[in-house]
Amino acid sequence: MEKRIGTVSILISDTSIVPEVNRILSDFGAMIIARQGVPMHQHGFNIITLIIEGTTDELSSLTGKLGRLQGVEVKSMLAKTRRQEIKN
């Protein structure tokens, strides 16, 4: 299966689940190119954004595991351009 570049946005409203989110992200570390976390304490949640490179199956597995956690919302997007079409 072809790898594609994409993004994942994670909104965490229950901070007690953060260790589990970090464990899942660590399990998928090979596909994570960049990660940015922003605490939004004044709004009562935290946001993590990821830039990833992986197959659609890998992305589905990652977002599925995160999305099943109480207090976590996940949205993802993959570029239409496939990896071999990207010029170096």
Predicted regions, residues:
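Long, contiguous binding/interaction regions
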Residues: 1-88
